[in-house]
Amino acid sequence: MKKIKNLILTISIVYIAQGYAQDNVETAALWPFDEQLGIYPSCVISDLSDNDYPLVLGPGGQIVPGKFGNSLEPIEHPKIEYPEDDNVKFGLKALPVPEGRMMEPMNWMNANFCALMTSGENHLRKQVGFVHPTETALNLGQFNWTVEFWYQPTRSSPDNGVVFEIGEGPRGENQKITQLLLDSEEHAFLLVNQPGNVILRIPSDPEISNHLSGDWYHLAFVYDDTEGQLIHFVNGERQTLPERCSIIALSRGEEDYMSIGRDGLWNNPLPGKIDELRFSKGKRYQENFPPPESFSYIVKDEKPVKKVSGKKLLFVDNEVPILLENRKHLFLDDVLIVENKNITFSVNPPKMAERVIENIKGPFRKHLNVIEDDDGLLRIYNAVDDDYLAVRTSEDGINWEVPDLPNGYYKDKTNIVLHESTGMGVVFIDPNASPEERWKYISDYHRRGVFLYHSADGWSFKRYKIPVLPFRSGSQANLFYDDQRQLYVAYHRSDFTKTLSGDTERTFVMTETADLIKPWPFKPVSQEKSLEMAMSHRVHDLHPWYLDNGPLTPMGFSFEYPNIFGPDDSIDPRETDIYVPKAMKYPWAEDTYLAFPVVYFHYEESTPLTRVILMDPDRGRGSGPIETQVATSRDGIHWKRFPRPVYIGNGQHENWPVNQAYMAHGMIRRGDEIWQYYFGTEIYHSTWSKDKSKSAVYRVVQRFDGFISADSPYEKEGYLITKPLIFAGNRLVLNIDTDATGYAQVGFLDEDGQPIPGFTVDDCVFINGDFIETEVEWFPNWRDFPSMEGKKIEELEPYKKEFRFSKDVSALQGKVVQVVFRMRGSKLYSMQFMER
């Protein structure tokens, strides 16, 4: 015990000696400004403290390179021409000055702030969750407090520059403010506090005004309320003390605000960059101290991670011969095929099983996510009351239970895993993460952007505070790790495109990142570029698209990322769109990506009237039905969608009507079967009906590897010849179904395209039956024996000892060959060369 006391005393002495105060200090807010470079006005700037006080970036500020990661600088975004529009909520129409006021209400044309939170401007869309700053410890007053940040001067200015301003509001209507300004010419700061009638000059180091040095300076302001003394530090060095004063907090304001980098009229920009701005309740420093390192997890977590690495994608470069080696190849398409006669690639819808979750009461999000944990327990995640993420579990995949989680209580629920309104995402297990963060979840949060969450076990998630993407997302995001490209791939809804009728059309863009935790790669699209691209795309008329939700709420995706999933005018009926793609990398074969797009057929905003009339309330439907289709890809970028036969359609399922079928994200393997789940309901989208009793989660069963097959006709033979390839192994194994009256034979061609003796198609023993795995067999000397036409099997007996059969293809491995399939009335699902 004595050793422990001495250790504590030693730590305390070191702590005090370094200048760190022994005050009870709490972080009120910490803005590291580590969002992506170039993010648009209206994007959220996140607070890393537990208080979670968001700011919004304005046209008068930019995210730029900083001391640690990125920083904030009060420099204006490129000027744009604002379109004429009557939309007040989105800030595209200027309102007159209200009676009794002096300031014009905020709109895009006058919103030249740098970074802002506000309780006013309520004529605009505000969805990010601003707080009243006057009700927080940001409202500096009669308590001990610390304000600190890193600063780099970048230009000279004869005017005072604002670090921050907090006002009771309404903004610009009075002088009830607390404000910190930099007086570059006097090498000092000014603290203005109207309630305390204070204008305090704070001497500082002259070097903080030297914009030519390129240096960064850590600036701290510590206020001792008992002494009425403010202490200023530059790079941990105490500066000349200013006069004593009494700082009094502002009164609560119904329209209070906090502005960073500019004042409440958007004037007096700070002539430099500001990084890692932290407000604390308490005195963090009392004597000289070494300047702190970064507080941001974005910077601290810069550790190299060895990623799980798969084989290089096989079909990206179209190189021949194809190094197939021992990869399994699913016959999803003709990517491996050089010659095709009478073969078609067909969808194989799953078999309907049973309802596994019914008697659904209360809010229940249709966007489900199924996953199997390390212990074989199955989980279904989806959002329930207030969009809180919940989980159900099952040992057998059929009987599902609501677990009683220690932290799972909310309303009448016991299975809540995330106590934030953010149920529009996907849970997955990150193979590259530490054990404490293996479980990941991605979702839109509070319309602030797309956020990542982490968990050790999937029972309780915690949010990384900085969004990985600055865009709001209106539907379930999809995310997976692609081991073959060592990238995390995600798909996000965009509402930028429009239907032929001009209504919003749902499509999905794709993002890729090598680092899941840091903000993901982003490149802004200029107004000029947006207008140029709009010439060849059917999109809304608002350019740039970030204007869409007004200056105080982030926008959706536009042209920043490739649009991967959307309706195809050449095959889809008009006013049809992709609700969610449900895209994933197939776990049991390389070079195989599957998606199950949820496709929405609109009644409203369509044509002709004979279609629109289906939405008539008297018909009791709604805005349209929804089905699930299937799509395939070899790289996760280029997709082929198979609309028919529909993968999961409408109709009677287990004697219940289904008019909306939403595939769950994820799949489970059980032996020779793939289990999938979907949410089905009898009501239509945007339904007129109030009866939701017949809504359920259903299980469906797919053959292993059986989503798409290469099908040969029944009435004649079909042929497939592969491109030249090189394989490894001594057996060729097929997943194939010929039923009773179909058959298949397989052979090899050499590098010159000639049949290889002993391995010709004619030498192949007929494949007849239904097999998940069957080894191809050859009968190379069958020609040495009399024809068996019209003879009985007993007549073979004298020759059987001379028959030579072989499944061994090792003599061909490593050589350039082509594989030939001759089939009739058969379905070929996959092939794989194996060592057995």
Go through each PLM region and give its residues.
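Beta-rich carbohydrate-recognition and catalytic domains
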Residues: 304-477, 481-580, 585-658, 678-836
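Localized edge beta-strand/strand-to-loop motifs within extracellular or lumenal beta-rich domains
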Residues: 215-231, 738, 824
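Short, solvent-exposed beta-strand-to-loop segments that form ligand-recognition rims
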Residues: 234-256
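Short, aromatic/His-centered strand-loop micro-motif at the edge of beta-sheets
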Residues: 190-218
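Extracytoplasmic low-complexity segments
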Residues: 20-126, 240-243, 276, 290-310
